[in-house]
Swiss-Prot record:
Job description of the protein: Possible component of hydrogenase 4.
Family classification: To E.coli HycH.
Pfam families the record matches: HycH
Keyword Oxidoreductase in annotation: yes
InterPro entries according to UniProt: Formate_DH_maturation_HycH
Organism of provenance: Escherichia coli (strain K12)
GO molecular-function term, one example from the UniProt record: oxidoreductase activity
Keywords: Oxidoreductase
Designated gene of the protein: hyfJ
Protein name: Hydrogenase-4 component J
Length: 137
C-alpha cells in the first residue's frame, strides 16, 4: 500500500475469507460459520478496500463543523490513537452528526459527508461490515 503523508485514510471491509489450504469437512464448516456468527475469527482474514482519503488539515476542518460532541470525539480518536474502527454501534450517532453537513448545499463538505453517510448506511444494511480509519503521517 502506498499512502501519501499527512492524511486520514478510511478503509471498508468488503469481504472475508478463511485462510486454509485444507479441505474442510461439512460438519467442521458449520462450526466455523457459527464461530463467525458469534464474533470469533477462526482463521478468517478481513479484506479492506480504501473508501476515501482526506488530508489531515481538511479532516480537522471537516470535524470542526460537527456539533455533536460525542461523534466529534469518536472521529478525532484517529488523531489521538492513530486508528479508529467504526462499526454498527456507531452508525446512528455518526449519521445524526453528519446529516446537517450532508444536507447543507452550500457546504464544501457536503459531498464528503454524503459519502461518509453512505458508508455508514452500508454498515446498517450489513452489520459485519466496518470502517477503519488510520492516520498516515
Amino acid at each position: 500500500m502506498t499512502e501519501e503523508c499527512g492524511e486520514i485514510v478510511f478503509w471498508t471491509l468488503r469481504k472475508k475469507f478463511v485462510a486454509s489450504s485444507d479441505e474442510m469437512p461439512e460438519h467442521s464448516s458449520q462450526v466455523m460459520y457459527y464461530s463467525l456468527a458469534i464474533g470469533h475469527h477462526v482463521g478468517v482474514i478481513d479484506c479492506l478496500n480504501v473508501a476515501f482519503r482526506c488530508p489531515l488539515t481538511e479532516y480537522e476542518d471537516w470535524l470542526a463543523l460537527v456539533e455533536e460532541e460525542q461523534a466529534r470525539r469518536k472521529m478525532l480518536g484517529v488523531m489521538t490513537f492513530g486508528e479508529i474502527v467504526i462499526d454498527a454501534s456507531h452508525t446512528a450517532l455518526l449519521t445524526r452528526a453528519f446529516a446537517p453537513l450532508a444536507d447543507d448545499a452550500t457546504s464544501v463538505w457536503q459531498a464528503r459527508s454524503i459519502q461518509f453517510i453512505h458508508l455508514l448506511d452500508e454498515i446498517v444494511q450489513e452489520p459485519a461490515i466496518y470502517l477503519m480509519a488510520r492516520k498516515i503521517a
